[in-house]
Amino acid sequence: MRLGPRPAALGLLLPLLLYAAVAGASKAEELHYPQGEHRADYDREALLGVQEDVDEYVKLGHEEQQRRLQSIIKKIDSDSDGFLTENELSQWIQMSFKHYAMQEAKQQFVEYDKNSDGAVTWDEYNIQMYDRVIDFDENTALDDTEEGSFRQLHLKDKKRFEKANQDSGPGLSLEEFIAFEHPEEVDYMTEFVIQEALEEHDKNGDGFVSLEEFLGDYRRDPTANEDPEWILVEKDRFVNDYDKDNDGRLDPQELLSWVVPNNQGIAQEEALHLIDEMDLNSDKKLSEEEILENQDLFLTSEATDYGRQLHDDYFYHDEL
């Protein structure tokens, strides 16, 4: 197959999706909790939304679902006292997040490593992502605005690739590839993530991100009496979620909590939600009986990765 140039709009789409996976985490949360209300169907859609996964879920009989679920409950119960606390649920959900992120990265590594030599080169990454090797000259003027935006994102990817390549070899090892795909999971990538975010959002170069910079190019319509709902939501997030010291700007650490998905916070929120919904005797913890009584709810939550763990013996196997 001849690898020719791809349409600019399509070329832009892929890196934008990658960027949105990190910077747009708050949008997914809005879908999960519209107007602050939990959508149980979103839980199932999020990972069981693929029809093949739904089919596998349905194939399991009720007794087998229950057996595997009981095995998972025992593993979540780290102190073996017969109850699941908020902390135990939160720790389990965070472990689940990391497990699936690592599994996905390992699968991607095999796909990207075209010559199966145990390393992913920059050219191999480009071929897998864009069907062609892209080599932008940073200083060449481009007439096409979309192509210019794509070049900017592509060069960012290249910088992240080079940062992940700790040994400066010809390609990324599996561990380095994981650092490239999931920099939030690797300590040596933290500073790079912060600097990348500052370059993107810190327009005046003071080392902080103000509310105006946080909102990007938004300007209120002069004919409107108030900001649109999504702007009000983003302002609320800035003030209440990210600006911890209330100084009206985000320092590098506060910025990190914005641009990197906060798995700990998400996991804690889901743990509290489950206890609130399933704790029949109001003791702030869950017994096996309470969970089995609300089995459908538990299987549409992040505690079982929306039922996915029932099909992954890493979680329900006795030797985890």
From Swiss-Prot:
In which residues is Ca(2+) 6 bound?
279, 281, 283, 285, 290
What is a single molecular function from GO for this protein?
Answer: calcium ion binding
Q: Which residues carry this modification: Phosphothreonine?
A: 140
* Binding, Ca(2+) 4: 202, 204, 206, 213
Any idea where this protein resides? Endoplasmic reticulum lumen
Pinpoint motif Prevents secretion from ER by residue range.
Answer: 317-320
Question: Which amino acid positions bind Ca(2+) 2, per UniProt?
Answer: 113, 115, 117, 124
User: Could you identify this protein by its name?
Assistant: Reticulocalbin-2
